[in-house]
Amino acid sequence: IDILIIVGAAGLVIGTLNLTGLAFGLTLQLLAVSGDSILILLLMTAVIAIILGMGMPTVGVYILLATLIAPALIEAGISPMASHMFVMYFGMMSMVTPPVAIAAFAAANIAGCDGSKAGWAATRVGWCSYIVPFLFALSPSLLMEGTMTSVLWTVTTASIGILAGTVAVVGYFSTAV
């Protein structure tokens, strides 16, 4: 029954946006503002996805973002799989991104620590979670699209880069985590 309520509410929002033309207008505005820059389009859609995903459950976030934002990414030339994974990923990142950070606040409550500090710590430790969607949007071989050699090369180099970046951000080699 919970899923029916979520899907019904998302359907009402999406239906309203489609009837008023705002869904199509958002796609056009995103493409117009970004111009020919895929990176600017990805940054704008990431911010919008995090904002729209705050406080919403997974299914509702995906339905909303797949209707509003994914068409702009597909129109810009990003593969449909990468576009939908990008919006889904950033919609879910709203759960650990302050100020809402529902998952971080729940973990802080269990651990008995300050929710705000837990949210910022989750953002700092999980920095690579904000980078990975850009990687697979720009290089779909991370989503197993393409030849086996390109997939292996991309996964290997991305893994090494994320490991090195995480060690640098967290400071694991110089201090204990």
Language model: regions and residue ranges:
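Hydrophobic transmembrane alpha-helices that form the pore/transport pathway of multi-pass ion
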Residues: 58-93, 100-117
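Hydrophobic residues within the alpha-helical transmembrane core of Major Facilitator Superfamily
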Residues: 13, 47, 93, 131-134, ...
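C-terminal accessory/binding modules appended to enzymatic or scaffolding proteins
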Residues: 161-177
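Core transmembrane alpha-helical segments of multi-pass membrane transporters/permeases
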Residues: 1-22, 38, 42-51, 55, ...
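Alpha-helical transmembrane segments of multi-pass membrane proteins
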Residues: 38-52, 77-93, 117-128
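Transmembrane helix-loop boundary segments of multi-pass membrane transporters
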Residues: 86-89, 115-129, 136-160
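Membrane-interface helix termini and inter-helical loops of multi-pass transporters
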Residues: 17-33, 140-150
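Hydrophobic transmembrane alpha-helical segments of multi-pass transport and channel proteins
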Residues: 51, 55-56, 72-75, 92-99, ...
